[in-house]
Amino acid sequence: MLQFKLVLLGDSSVGKSSIVHRFVKDTFDELRESTIGAAFLSQSITIHPNDGNETKDVVIKFEIWDTAGQERYKSLAPMYYRNANAALVVYDITQEDSLQKARNWVDELKNKVGDDDLVIYLLGNKVDLCQETPSTETSPDSNEGGDEEQKVRAISTEEAKQYAQEQGLLFREVSAKTGEGVKEIFQDIGEKLYDLKKDEILSKQNRQIGGGNNGQVDINLQRPSTNDPTSCCS
């Protein structure tokens, strides 16, 4: 089993916690309270990499740090992303300034961590809430039977996708509420990390097997970090 550290970043109310809980517990809570500081969860997936002519199952365990988005907690974020293998940077597609705030997080990651072997995934959340363009006519009965007000998309898919391509980021739009695209996020990350770390994985596997470990091989691939303040609890 391979172990990777993953961190979620983004401003308050973009849906970071909802994405994590949809992935880990397959639940959604409309009234979820804001995260204080950070929350830790873990979940495993199976990927099917093709090494040469052989396809095999590989189990990946994600150690997930869900950080608070409020401004007063922003200074704590480096404690959690410093030695992460992957970062999910989340924005709200219905809020006009949300993508710019996500860009700021990406800039911070690249400046303070670097992106040589850090997988950064840009996520546009809340696709379930919006109509693609403003409606020219509104019927008084148009929301009859509906529980949720529809919103106008404020950030186009094309704008966010182009930015992600320019920055070398993975990109996807998702809905934590319906689950659309959420599982695919973590499959994408698992496959990308396996490809990036393949040589290191094989080397560590061979050393463990050569040392007499013929059972399950557990490999922690968390990025090294000096004076890491989270080392006592991660």
Swiss-Prot record:
Region (Disordered) residue spans: 131-151, 206-234
Lipidation (S-geranylgeranyl cysteine): C232, C233
Keyword Lipoprotein in annotation: yes
SUPFAM superfamilies with a match to the protein in the record: P-loop containing nucleoside triphosphate hydrolases
Residues given in the record as GTP binding sites: 10-17, 66-70, 111-114
Record field: compositional bias (Polar residues): 132-142, 217-234
Xref: PROSITE patterns: RAB
Cellular component, GO annotation: cytosol; endomembrane system; endoplasmic reticulum; fungal-type vacuole membrane; late endosome; plasma membrane
Location(s) in or outside the cell: Cell membrane; Endoplasmic reticulum
GO biological process, alphabetically ordered: endocytosis; Golgi to endosome transport; intracellular protein transport; late endosome to vacuole transport via multivesicular body sorting pathway; multivesicular body assembly; protein localization to endosome; protein targeting to vacuole
Location in chain, cross-link Glycyl lysine isopeptide (Lys-Gly) (interchain with G-Cter in ubiquitin): K151
Modified residues annotated as Phosphoserine in this record: S139, S142
KW Transport (keyword) present: yes
Membrane topology, as annotated: Lipid-anchor
Protein family according to the UniProt entry: Belongs to the small GTPase superfamily. Rab family.
Extra remark beyond the main annotation: Present with 9380 molecules/cell in log phase SD medium.
This protein's name: GTP-binding protein YPT52
Organism: Saccharomyces cerevisiae (strain ATCC 204508 / S288c)
Gene responsible for this protein: YPT52
